[in-house]
Design a protein with these regions (language model features):
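Extended catalytic cores of very large enzyme megasubunits
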Residues: 1-269
């Protein structure tokens, strides 16, 4: 309610041109819808409900990018393709048979994605969906991410006859937003990256071995999408004597610059 298809057409069509591609039409249409979300920017025609129209438009574009069509293929085909591409762990095909994946496929409700706001779809794309970070290509859609995460969590559940029930319950709760998962968990489950800590606290002592070891650990954890907390309270201030005054401490600033460089060198955002 409170949205108008004709208003979207009126807003987007002036930007169309001869020879325009369908991708460009999608992008211009999305931009027009997003502009209508802001009631201050469009006081007479805008409404916050356009955020859900924009979500549907962005989802349509995502599915075309990932699957080449709006309707997703079978879950087994998606998993098999992404395992072959090295984006999913090969263990997924060891833990579960094709029949198991087909059973999970029946549990998925892809229509849930159509109820998401534009901001929610963009957040899933930007933070959680498996992608090639060099090319930007995305390889799954939100409901697939939730199901692969559920399958990974319960792959060792005993008895095996109960696994599918647990997977279904977990998937339904996660996809309905009844609980949230930390970014490295939701983004990493089912992938070759086995690091699920959102925040890692690293403590540095006031000696070179510890200072340089802290920098190494920061870089390694950052490369696996972990957030970093650094405790530096043990470092002495500038000018403090070292080895009885043979040399003096250079203070925190040089080491803070070093640690910042270590972090930025491998940060994945």
């Amino acid at each position: 309610s409170d949205v108008s298809q004709s208003m979207i057409e009126i807003t987007s069509q002036p930007h169309f041109f001869d020879g325009i591609t369908t991708r460009e039409i999608d992008e211009l249409t999305l931009r027009a819808i997003v502009d209508l979300i802001d009631e201050e920017q469009a006081p007479e025609t805008g409404h916050t409900n356009y955020q859900f129209v924009a979500g549907k438009q962005r989802l349509s574009m995502l599915r075309k990018d990932v699957y080449g069509q709006y309707q997703p293929p079978s879950l087994y085909e998606i998993v098999k393709k992404n395992v072959k591409a090295g984006l999913y762990t090969p263990e997924l095909l060891d833990w579960y048979s094709e029949e198991d994946w087909n059973e999970m496929d029946k549990m998925i409700n892809h229509e849930k994605d159509e109820d998401a706001s534009y901001a929610a779809v963009e957040q899933m794309i930007g933070k959680y969906l498996v992608r090639n970070r060099s090319t930007g290509q995305i390889y799954e859609t939100p409901q697939v991410r939730y199901m692969v995460a559920a399958a990974t969590v319960f792959h060792k559940e005993e008895p095996e006859s109960a696994r599918m029930r647990y997977i279904k319950e977990y998937y339904n709760c996660a996809s309905d937003g009844l609980f949230t998962l930390a970014t490295p968990v939701l983004a990493g489950l089912g992938t070759p990256t086995k690091q699920f800590s959102s925040c890692v606290l690293i403590k540095s002592d006031d000696d070179l071995d510890s200072i340089f070891a802290s920098g190494e650990m920061m870089a390694k954890y950052a490369s696996k999408r972990a957030g970093i907390g650094l405790e530096i309270g043990r470092l002495r201030p500038l000018g403090s004597p070292i080895r009885g005054g043979e040399i003096m401490h250079t203070g925190m600033i040089p080491f803070l610059k070093k640690w910042f460089g270590d972090l930025r060198s491998c940060s994945q955002g």
